[in-house]
Amino acid sequence: MVAFTVDQMRSLMDKVTNVRNMSVIAHVDHGKSTLTDSLVQRAGIISAAKAGEARFTDTRKDEQERGITIKSTAISLYSEMSDEDVKEIKQKTDGNSFLINLIDSPGHVDFSSEVTAALRVTDGALVVVDTIEGVCVQTETVLRQALGERIKPVVVINKVDRALLELQVSKEDLYQTFARTVESVNVIVSTYADEVLGDVQVYPARGTVAFGSGLHGWAFTIRQFATRYAKKFGVDKAKMMDRLWGDSFFNPKTKKWTNKDTDAEGKPLERAFNMFILDPIFRLFTAIMNFKKDEIPVLLEKLEIVLKGDEKDLEGKALLKVVMRKFLPAADALLEMIVLHLPSPVTAQAYRAEQLYEGPADDANCIAIKNCDPKADLMLYVSKMVPTSDKGRFYAFGRVFAGTVKSGQKVRIQGPNYVPGKKDDLFIKAIQRVVLMMGRFVEPIDDCPAGNIIGLVGIDQFLLKTGTLTTSETAHNMKVMKFSVSPVVQVAVEVKNANDLPKLVEGLKRLSKSDPCVLTYMSESGEHIVAGTGELHLEICLQDLEHDHAGVPLKISPPVVAYRETVESESSQTALSKSPNKHNRIYLKAEPIDEEVSLAIENGIINPRDDFKARARIMADDYGWDVTDARKIWCFGPDGNGPNLVIDQTKAVQYLHEIKDSVVAAFQWATKEGPIFGEEMRSVRVNILDVTLHADAIHRGGGQIIPTMRRATYAGFLLADPKIQEPVFLVEIQCPEQAVGGIYSVLNKKRGQVVSEEQRPGTPLFTVKAYLPVNESFGFTGELRQATGGQAFPQMVFDHWSTLGSDPLDPTSKAGEIVLAARKRHGMKEEVPGWQEYYDKL
């Protein structure tokens, strides 16, 4: 345990080469918070007795009750390395003390937006995988997010104690399980990794994989064992590391290494990993768990483990825990892996800068980020807001990428829509103070140089969720984060007592600040809507709203799903609309956009902010668009970045450029609220074929053009075989074989489609993957548990939009029922207007 003061930390912050910013990511319940504990205990915050139970990073009451992590929390740890270890570090270092900023993030699918916020400010990730369950859907989602942010992974295979005690596996089986898990991680890594990163696959023989048990507080890497044996046998450590993994076998008779699993006489040899690493661990486990009093002291002496006074009287699991912790302390293995293999900010920002910064790659600010320069202009990205103990105020939590942030410093606070040279979304204010985030506590400090993670007080009222702080007037923003989930489940919230309304409004503002992925808005009919990514996420948000942010009793409507409106074919005739003064006409047609193009727009591969020539090139080469069309994209909608497009296909129209702004504004409006039931449009492409305009500018202003364009868009849309799309979850369910039948019956009842079912080799568990419409997912978890006797655990994550085949204009069809219910709820006329209503005759 290190006694560790703020001053020591502050001095380490200046040696940026010795800082490591990393996050812990994993599937839900694979043991992130538990592993984090053994690290925190090493840095001197939890007592050793509590590690494994305290879950120090789960700061909220509901996190401790539910046993899940909901918000990501940050902690700074201090670690000292021996000189020979420091020599092995491939990057520049200075001295042997290291500062590790660790962020524990939630594993539950519904909170993956929290994970994104954590990943943005870190350079490395500790991926935790359960030995028995292996790589699950969420491990893959989060790992994909990390690699997309150019973050280097290292892996911990956790819960090895379960494999030994519950499943009683043999050594070779355990080795095969490990090897399979490492392989499935590497498959994901090689699929999604960025070339810039080089080879970021994980190799046990290089020490980038650790094995252990968070609950018992022990872990090891192959490097640690190689170091032990290298000293004992006087061999080279690097050679030893290679031999302790994979197909290498040691023949004790001839004292020779071979890569065949039999010796000359055909007797089977034992794999080196099993013989040198697993054997001592298995022996300890068997001796202690079978209460062999005489064998234990002999083993302990061989392994140089000394028990103190009252520890000698322990037996069974309690003794096992103490012994394993002394033999292989988890913190040593993990800290060594983090310090040796994860990049320092200096190394990482060199290759992450261009991806973090919106402006050109050669301007002063981008170069300062690349060099992680503490003397340059300040560049700080706020990735989220953390509620303080005093109600309604927030710390801004983020990372300094360049420059130094000081208490009392005046900074430019740039929101996500800021454009250099304009005044929108910009505040110039002073930071009241700079604090260090330590899990449940904060420590004030004076200033903080580039490369570190930090909390700021006093700027929360100027930022919604994220933003860039800078002192340079020419600086562009840091790029906005891409969330892999979208808010698709909504509820309407009302107050029970009308006097509390102002508190609700204030509470909704605070809620949308504190959670990066929640949407709050007011609908046409005056309801307050809260949208979240799934049932659990919404439940937590509403609980926060009721108890913390608003603090008043609320009435909550049953959840509703967000739909999208789309078209299936090209408009059957050209839609024409005249302006209110009859002097201007717009002719257009609507047609569908391919799903892959819509996805590319939603995932930011095709970006409205890109150079139009480069964008046209991509669309022509990868998606088969006509280059002239791709160059003439006027805008994306809704909100300027959605998957709907306006294409200018007119020939030689006078004054056309003058109405472009009005057309764009009208299109944003039309795509935000479609004609069928006021939901957003998706995958609709509008081709403007011809425009007739009045010669006098005064007769073709916004007031004439905007309503015309909107009517024309609606008419074209309704003529093009309109359909509605519903959101679909990908569900992954892990369960024992006898429960599979129960899962199928529940899925069939809820319009689910099973995609795959496979057994995990070496375990009795089955993994079922299925598509489940979000609309049907409410109460799914409960029904599933009932049908399978509590043996199945579903994980749901938004996967795609699926088009409903039936006709939304026919009130008797499935789609028509949904439309009718929504129109009633929104207070619109019950029948959908026909295209004639928006179409004008010549």
Swiss-Prot record:
In the UniProt annotation, what is the result of changing residue 699 to D/E/L/M/I? Prevents post-translational modification of this residue to diphthamide. Results in a functional protein that is resistant to diphtheria toxin and sordarin
Tell me, what is an example of a GO biological process annotation in this record? translational elongation
Q: What is its main location?
A: cytoplasm
Q: Where is this cross-link: Glycyl lysine isopeptide (Lys-Gly) (interchain with G-Cter in ubiquitin)?
A: 841
| Modification comment | (Microbial infection) Diphthamide can be ADP-ribosylated by diphtheria toxin and by Pseudomonas exotoxin A, thus abolishing its function.
Activity regulation info: Inhibited by fusidic acid and sordarin, which prevent the release of eEF2 from the ribosome after the translocation step. While fusidic acid acts on all eukaryotic eEF2, sordarin specifically binds and inhibits only selected fungal eEF2.
Q: Which residues carry this modification: Diphthamide?
A: 699
Q: Which domain of life is it from?
A: Eukaryota
Keywords of the record, alphabetical order, are:
Cytoplasm, Elongation factor, GTP-binding, Hydrolase, Isopeptide bond, Methylation, Nucleotide-binding, Phosphoprotein, Protein biosynthesis, RNA-binding, rRNA-binding, Ubl conjugation
N6,N6-dimethyllysine sites (modified residues): 509, 613
| InterPro entries assigned | EFG_II, EFG_III/V, EFG_V-like, EFTu-like_2, G_TR_CS, P-loop_NTPase, Ribosomal_Su5_D2-typ_SF, Ribsml_uS5_D2-typ_fold_subgr
Residues that bear N6-methyllysine: 509, 613
Binding positions (GTP): 26-33, 158-161, 213-215
What the record says about family reads: Belongs to the TRAFAC class translation factor GTPase superfamily. Classic translation factor GTPase family. EF-G/EF-2 subfamily.
Can you name this protein?
Elongation factor 2
Tell me what organism the protein belongs to: Saccharomyces cerevisiae (strain ATCC 204508 / S288c)
